[in-house]
């Protein structure tokens, strides 16, 4: 089978769908030129493939090596329907590439008149200059130039030249495709790992920042008592299910090994510059989480959990809380698979009871509806996002477990958005059977995001 980039170029929708259904495939990877699958589908005008990639979570504003976004390529080649689709999903209409050109520069240069009109109607600036001092209108033939000038004036644009600045891109979420080879290495040679700095140490092990094959990574070295052949076998059998590359809101385990001389099981995952959601909310990062960003994080988490809940069987021993949600460089929240517990790791112990559903504290795991319990955890995360507080911060884990089991609940303070407040209460229904499923709350959060 040809690679995914060829399938996207050729518009082979069936092959692309089969490739996307494999959880070990990363739809945001790049080829040797930094083109993502979405870049190629937009360049070649493959509308069905573009739709499929966007629906599965392809990054809209991803850049290739020349800083072109998919919108640059669709505009250059006159694929009007794809341009409109990208704009519908909030593509950056004035994104600049390495030459300082925005998509409108290319639509004008290549005579894509309808695309140019659509771009201006949606806010593309007609007088923004590239590195060479040229505006998009300078690239257009006379009739189109006059039409765009007239349209821009009607929309209230200032037609004075806007000089090029290196900072045009700041404040936008620009990312590059990920290394497409990382998902090919399930088994990793411990000797290839370069440990740079210890980030944390707790009951479950050590967390390190490291480098592997030229990539920044996080290395998690697990603490396990009485390591045995059976535990080694369980580790090797359970790891592959954590290599989920196919969803943008799930952070996969890249690979695993057992480190010498003492066999410490070791997991490797992507480096996340902002750390966890807990770090962002409670540990004084420079990241500002306003109402809009809080809803975005909630939507990201709901989408990730909706996907995980489609897996059969469910990933066992996964606990949803703000320490197990990581924040990517483009401010995307991702459910971390490296935080899933293995069968040999302290069965029965609860390390974050503040986020655990009361029935999960009172019953055995096999007697608990995991999907409903996860929805309770999500409700606590909503509370955390809007209050910026740690739930039950003044209590010990044992006290928290007792309190939640005995109907102690986080208090919803006044001033919270009524929409968020209502959603929180629905998700935290005392009757697990009455809590919604994640695929039911995703559309609600999408509407809240659009307001």
Swiss-Prot record:
Membrane topology: Peripheral membrane protein
Domain Protein kinase residues, every copy: 193-445
PTM sites of type Phosphothreonine: 173
Record keywords: Acetylation, ANK repeat, ATP-binding, Cell junction, Cell membrane, Cell projection, Cytoplasm, Cytoskeleton, Magnesium, Membrane, Metal-binding, Nucleotide-binding, Nucleus, Phosphoprotein, Repeat
Modification(s) after translation: Phosphorylation by PAK1 modulates ILK subcellular location by promoting its nuclear export.
Similarity annotation: Belongs to the protein kinase superfamily. TKL Ser/Thr protein kinase family.
Protein's name in the database: Scaffold protein ILK
Organism of provenance: Cavia porcellus
């Amino acid at each position: 089978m040809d690679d995914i980039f060829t399938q996207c170029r050729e518009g082979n929708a069936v092959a692309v769908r089969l490739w996307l259904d494999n959880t070990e495939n990363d739809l945001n990877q790049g080829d040797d030129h930094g083109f993502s699958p979405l870049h190629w589908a937009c360049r070649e005008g493959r509308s069905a493939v573009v739709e499929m990639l966007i629906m599965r979570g392809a990054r809209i504003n991803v850049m290739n090596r020349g800083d072109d976004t998919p919108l640059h390529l669709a505009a250059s080649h006159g694929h009007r329907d794809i341009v409109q689709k990208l704009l519908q999903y909030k593509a950056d209409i004035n994104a600049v590439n390495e030459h300082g050109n925005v998509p409108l520069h290319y639509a004008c240069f290549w005579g894509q008149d309808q695309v140019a009109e659509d771009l201006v109607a949606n806010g593309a600036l007609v007088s923004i200059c590239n590195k060479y001092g040229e505006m998009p209108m300078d690239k257009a033939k006379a009739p189109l130039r006059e039409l765009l000038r007239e349209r821009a004036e009607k929309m209230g644009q200032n037609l004075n030249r806007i000089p090029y600045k290196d900072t045009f891109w700041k404040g936008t979420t620009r990312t590059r495709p990920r290394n497409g080879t990382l998902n090919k290495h399930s088994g990793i040679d411990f000797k290839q790992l370069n440990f740079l700095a210890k980030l944390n140490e707790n009951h479950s092990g050590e967390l390190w920042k490291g480098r592997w094959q030229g990539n920044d990574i996080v290395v998690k070295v697990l603490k396990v008592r009485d390591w045995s052949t059976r535990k080694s076998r369980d580790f090797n059998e359970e790891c592959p299910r954590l290599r989920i590359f196919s969803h943008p809101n799930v952070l996969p385990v890249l690979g695993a090994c057992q480190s010498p001389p003492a066999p410490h099981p070791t997991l490797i995952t992507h480096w996340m510059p902002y750390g966890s959601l807990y770090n962002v909310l409670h540990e004084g990062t420079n990241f500002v989480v306003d109402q809009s960003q809080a809803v975005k994080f909630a939507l990201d988490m709901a989408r990730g959990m909706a996907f995980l809940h489609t897996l059969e069987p469910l990933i066992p021993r996964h606990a949803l809380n703000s320490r197990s949600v990581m924040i990517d460089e483009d401010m995307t929240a991702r459910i971390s698979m490296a935080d899933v517990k293995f069968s040999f790791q302290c069965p029965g112990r609860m390390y974050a009871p503040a986020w655990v559903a009361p029935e999960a504290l009172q019953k055995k795991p096999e007697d608990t509806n995991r999907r409903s319990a996860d929805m309770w955890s999500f409700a606590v995360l909503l509370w955390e996002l809007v209050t910026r507080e740690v739930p039950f911060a003044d209590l010990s884990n044992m006290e928290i477990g007792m309190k939640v089991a005995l109907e102690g609940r986080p208090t919803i303070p006044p001033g919270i958005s009524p929409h968020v407040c209502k959603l929180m209460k629905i998700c935290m229904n005392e009757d697990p059977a009455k809590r919604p499923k994640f695929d039911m709350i995703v559309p609600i959060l999408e509407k809240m995001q659009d307001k």
